[in-house]
């Protein structure tokens, strides 16, 4: 993506979805992708997140309409949850989730080792606020990075002009 000024990319319209109704509204309103949480390993544990069966329905509904599905996996797992964590990631991978939004470097390393072609997006919780931060996460296999909200337009421009990852 270096040389960003030469080849402008169309921005992706990404919408949150906390329920099937909000998901359908977002998709029917023209979003390019949705992000949502599952019942496991998501930071919004008490939100109306989707169970595995619902996530499969979400993937089918969205993919039939050309919309991508990103699932947040943005909590830290415990040692005793490792097997459950990897099983959950495998289920998401097999149902066709388009990418995982992650905030834990160790969890991302595990995903990369077990599912090397599963796209990873760096969550805003990773606090990426410099070119060095973005380059680091890019080197760790993240292909999309959500920057810190504190950055100025000029700082964002500088970063996007100097990395391959999507911002």
Give names to the regions the model predicted:
Residues 5-167:
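Non-catalytic helical/linker scaffolds that mediate oligomerization, partner binding
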């Amino acid at each position: 993506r270096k040389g960003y000024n030469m080849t402008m990319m169309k921005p992706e319209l990404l919408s949150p979805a906390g329920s099937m109704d909000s998901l359908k509204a977002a998709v029917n309103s023209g979003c390019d992708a949705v992000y949502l949480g599952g019942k496991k390993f998501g930071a919004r544990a008490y939100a109306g997140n989707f169970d595995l069966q619902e996530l499969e329905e979400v993937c089918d509904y969205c993919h039939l309409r050309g919309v991508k599905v990103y699932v947040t996996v943005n909590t830290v797992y415990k040692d005793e949850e490792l097997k459950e964590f990897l099983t959950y990631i495998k289920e998401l991978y097999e149902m066709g989730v388009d990418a995982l939004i992650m905030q834990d470097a160790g969890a991302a390393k595990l995903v990369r080792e077990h599912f090397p072609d599963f796209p990873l997006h760096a969550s805003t919780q990773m606090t990426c606020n410099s070119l060095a931060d973005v380059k680091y996460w890019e080197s760790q296999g993240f292909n999309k990075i959500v920057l810190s909200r504190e950055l100025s337009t000029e700082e964002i421009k500088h970063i996007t002009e100097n990395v391959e990852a999507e911002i």
